[in-house]
């Protein structure tokens, strides 16, 4: 897919896109990503930006703690003189977890650091016809370790993005996977219908019902609002 954050491997661009893509669809992120970079084209500009500017640029994406942590990460990067180029250093940045650190490390610095999300877990569990619950922490660790050992030297970024693309477009979460188009179909142990039951998911918990009272303060045609910080 032609995605704006794949046109270069600038660490700031990759970090921004990965943070935006958390909890947000790809199509929705495109315009926000371009607008954000137009306003704050460098990590230094992000580090120095006013909070109101950040919140306005993020308006509509939700989960505002993401952009606040993104700025804290930018400030840490500027303070140390540049992006860390190792997995531990990337993980130490505010708001950066294993997936984001893996994406930045492999795409930008050619590190064998897997970026394992739901898409990658689905691809890998189907390849092996694995019937362990996809939510099991041990499964994620096992898959992360197996992928790290398989990363091709000099092509770590390509490998990460290929896995992302495979899970997003070929071996997707909804409906039948496009097995004829899959480049690893010959290795897949779930292609003959077993994919329907893989990945294995735990039983859904019953929804909790809450009853709350909401007070609205009105004076004529105006309503009192309290800004959430």
Language-model-derived ranges and their functions:
Residues 196-229:
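N-terminal strand-loop-strand
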């Amino acid at each position: 897919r032609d995605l704006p954050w794949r046109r270069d491997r600038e660490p700031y661009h990759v970090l921004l896109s990965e943070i935006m893509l958390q909890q947000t669809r790809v199509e929705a992120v495109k315009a926000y990503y371009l607008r954000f970079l137009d306003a704050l084209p460098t990590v230094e500009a992000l580090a120095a930006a006013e909070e109101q500017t950040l919140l306005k640029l993020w308006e509509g994406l939700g989960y505002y703690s993401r952009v606040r942590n993104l700025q804290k990460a930018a400030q840490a990067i500027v303070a140390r003189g540049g992006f860390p180029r190792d997995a531990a250093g990337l993980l130490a940045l505010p708001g950066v977890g294993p997936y984001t650190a893996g994406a930045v490390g492999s795409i930008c610095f050619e590190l064998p650091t897997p970026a394992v999300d739901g898409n990658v877990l689905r691809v890998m569990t189907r390849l092996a016809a694995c019937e362990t619950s996809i939510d099991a922490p041990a499964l994620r660790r096992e898959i992360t370790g197996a992928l790290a050992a398989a990363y091709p030297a000099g092509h770590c970024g390509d490998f990460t993005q290929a896995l992302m693309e495979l899970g997003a477009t070929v071996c997707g979460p909804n409906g039948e996977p496009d097995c004829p188009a899959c480049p690893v179909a010959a290795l897949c142990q779930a292609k003959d219908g077993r994919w329907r039951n893989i990945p294995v998911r735990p039983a859904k918990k019953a929804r909790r019902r809450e009853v709350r009272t909401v007070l609205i303060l009105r004076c004529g045609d105006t309503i009192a609002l309290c800004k959430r910080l």
